């Protein structure tokens, strides 16, 4: 499982112990990153920079397949943890998936982090001839999958009679190296998904709400909205909340000696629709941009201080970046490594 390290006696604004920071980078092996040939080098570079985890997403477009990619990385890396961010549940049966994931954990000598989500990119499902059910059905299926994975990834025998999946006497083999099982990560931006994550996950990734066209709502990047989501998770998880590691991904990193001017320019670009992955549903201020957990602007020291503040206010401690931002973010890691 993930480590629950915390500086002795220090608490977040939510009253939970401060967790030590962890850092993850995600790579797709797409053309923007140099293609599949450079993928292994990207993971090795992340390891050299001091990232704790290297994640592979799961889509059917211009990128490599996550399971085979992780298999390669088990032999091409030594210490960095390996994860999926996140596997689309509708692409694989949970029993088959459990076998592949357990194998990855064995081959990596216990370095796997299992990220699984409901699947959200409708065009991929339809193009592949896979059923794309309603959000409610996809969440029900994910609930069943996470229940099955919890048993099989412990090396136990699974007997499960669900609405969507039936498993009869399958034992989880090979038994993963990690005990009691590799950590499970899931997450999202909506309340139903976050409650489901609070039920099952060891790691919860908090993201802005995504629209049907795949864009994130601008309102979701604010610190206030993020705190609302953390409070929802805390209420849903109950006593388990202190054992859950909270993750988020910084989507924009700008190294500059003028934070406010850069934030003004970023806000102007967003308002003019120049950020293709965001849907503008609210008017934000420069202060909102500077306080957002998802935007890092400033010197290395200023960004480190911003991340400390995010942890203090939200209990989030597991920081993710994209591979195109690894070089920019790497100098921040030593500033936070032992905190």
Question: What positions do the PLM features span?
Answer:
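Active-site-adjacent structural elements that line small-molecule/cofactor binding pockets in enzymes
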Residues: 1-339
């Amino acid at each position: 499982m993930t480590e629950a390290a915390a500086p002795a006696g220090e608490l977040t604004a939510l009253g939970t112990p401060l967790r030590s920071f962890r850092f993850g980078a995600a790579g797709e092996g797409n053309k923007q990153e140099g293609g599949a040939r450079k993928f292994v080098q990207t993971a090795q570079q992340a390891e050299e920079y001091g990232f704790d985890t290297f994640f592979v997403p799961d889509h059917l477009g211009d990128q490599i397949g996550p399971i085979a990619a992780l298999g390669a990385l088990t032999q091409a890396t030594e210490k960095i943890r390996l994860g999926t961010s996140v596997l689309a549940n509708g692409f694989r049966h949970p029993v088959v998936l459990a076998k592949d994931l357990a194998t990855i954990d064995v081959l990596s000598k216990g370095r796997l982090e299992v990220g699984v989500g409901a699947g959200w990119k409708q065009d991929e499902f339809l193009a592949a001839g896979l059923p794309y059910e309603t959000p409610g059905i996809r969440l029900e299926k994910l609930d069943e999958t996470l229940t099955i994975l919890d048993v099989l990834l412990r090396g136990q025998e699974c007997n499960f009679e669900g609405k969507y999946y039936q498993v009869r006497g399958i034992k989880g083999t090979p038994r993963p190296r990690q005990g009691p099982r590799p950590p499970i990560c899931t997450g999202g931006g909506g309340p139903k998904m976050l409650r489901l994550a609070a039920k099952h996950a060891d790691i919860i990734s908090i993201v802005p709400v995504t629209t049907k066209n795949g864009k994130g709502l601008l309102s979701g990047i604010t610190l206030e909205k993020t705190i609302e989501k953390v409070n929802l998770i805390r209420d849903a998880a109950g006593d388990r909340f202190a054992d859950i590691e909270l993750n988020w991904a910084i989507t924009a990193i700008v190294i500059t000696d003028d934070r406010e001017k850069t934030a003004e320019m970023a806000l102007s670009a967003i308002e003019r629709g120049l950020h293709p992955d965001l849907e503008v549903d609210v008017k934000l201020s420069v202060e909102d941009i500077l306080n957002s957990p998802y935007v890092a602007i400033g010197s290395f020291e200023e960004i480190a201080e911003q991340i400390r503040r995010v942890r203090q206010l939200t209990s989030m401690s597991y920081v993710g970046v994209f591979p195109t931002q690894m070089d920019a973010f790497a100098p921040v890691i030593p500033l936070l490594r032992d905190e």
